[in-house]
Amino acid sequence: MPLLHEQRGHVAILTLSRPEARNAWGEDYNDGLKELLPQLEEDRNVRVVILTGDDRGGAFSAGANIKDPKTHTSASIADAIEALPKRRRHQAFNLLTDFAKPVIAAVNGYAVGIGCIATYCCDLIVASEKAEWRLPQVGLGILPAQGGTVRLSRWVGRGIAMRVAMGFPLKAEEAYRAGLAQWLVPHDELMVKAMEVAEHVASLPPLATRLAKEAVNFGLDVPLREAANADLYRFMALELTEDKAESHQAWRERRKPQIKGR
């Protein structure tokens, strides 16, 4: 299975592994995400997910796997439009975006086309100095699907999103300065840093991290006052949790809290 799954404590690591084709994105990745993400969401032992590329491929993902026999083709434009919401890639990316727990992209090299879009379907990005984002679709006479331009503009603003949409690359240092990557590290330290970030997130009360993610994403889509009012309900829901009581007690006693996810 080209989408590899490894468990380290409370951290699940998903690796795009097609190194002979620079981890090109095929339907098997979509199928793997559709199979694994619901399982990981239900697994109480999993508190955070890392998505990365097999470093033997020299890339996070070099884009769509054009040799994949399952690649969607349609007899007509009408058929293609009708099929769009049902495409496995579209469904997989929605699952990734809507996944309740935090997802960290560890970008180890080129993230091109669909591989580029996958990184900012995640919540946090740790970038290697070798990372580079590219959207070549407009140069091929098409558009980035799966919300490729819309999602990017929400991360970095209109100007940089427009630049990337027009085919200009975004290198690691620029991505870090623009806020697309929250951490930029030497290449050989990428997974160490990604695990450090993941383990910190995993150490937090998981119900609180889930609602914090929900609050940030919800706030992008609604007026400020509506988002702020919704936060009050999330706050009150967390007031009733065991982890909230334990965290406050541990703070008073100057000790590490025993987080249970309840």
Whereabouts are the PLM-identified features?
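Acidic-histidine catalytic/liganding microenvironments
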Residues: D43, G63, F99-A100, T241
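Terminal peptide-recognition signature
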Residues: L14, R18, L33, L51, ...
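C-terminal alpha-helix plus adjacent terminal tail
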Residues: M1-A12, R44, G53-R56, F168-E173, ...
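Crotonase-fold acyl-CoA enzyme core
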Residues: L95-T209, A245-Q249
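Charged catalytic carboxylate motif
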Residues: D28-G32, R88, L95, K193, ...
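Glycine- (often His-adjacent) and acidic-residue-rich active-site loop
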Residues: G53-L95, A111, G141, P223
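Conserved CoA-thioester-binding segment of acyl-CoA-metabolizing enzymes
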Residues: M1-D54
